[in-house]
Amino acid sequence: MRKKLWRAAALGLACVLIPSATVQAVTVNFGTAAAVATDSIQGWPAAPATVSETAVLIDADTGAVLYDKGMDEYRYPASTTKIMTLLVAVENASPRDTVTFTETGVRDVNWDSSNIGMKLGETMTMKDCWYAAIIESANEVCAQIAETVGGSEANFINMMNEKAKALGCTRTHFANAGGLPDANHYTTAHDLAKIMRAGLQNARFRKVIGAVSYTIPATNMSEARRMHTHMPLIAKESNLYYEG
């Protein structure tokens, strides 16, 4: 059952590359769906239609590409950025670490940015932060993870980009930990799949990425926060629930 959740989460996150009209540092195509390259392979099974502009399906064990819909075209990753944020965090921090929210984190608590309403001086564990970043896509939590794990946001972003290079992601550059709009923040479906594949090899990553719900205990400044996934592929109440 856990493996089904990881696969569903991987499928959803790898396909949701969000277009943006921001002036870009590279040529980022948006608004136009890519052609399915694998459909031109003789004898290869035709895949079902996807609504995403680009997509890729790879074998998690070997990395072999099974489906290619513009997999190497640049796109803005938006909150799928958090796949890398989580991976770098679980590899470089303990779930028991205490995270204290500074101006770095709370600056991203506003109406048009996904957040869980963290307050200046509020504390919770790194583990709680991981779940908030993935289940609620909390941007202020991602910023605070970055500062706490990296010593500074800038250093954590460097860690993200170095990790991307190490994984063979040649068309990816991160500018922040949450996926906020930035011309210098881009990736491809293929690179994102490589990151997800690496993450699935980490037990802590797998547990967080496949979580359907989680409760952050009461903090020094807030009551307990109950969170439930917004990813329809792993939510049983959704008509898009993937049973694997």
Short names for language-model regions:
Residues 169-170, 181-244:
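Domain-terminus/edge residues, biased toward the C-terminal soluble/receptor-binding domains
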Residues 1-29:
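Gram-positive cell-envelope targeting signals
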Residues 25-190, 194-203:
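Active-site-adjacent loops and short helices of periplasmic peptidoglycan-processing enzymes
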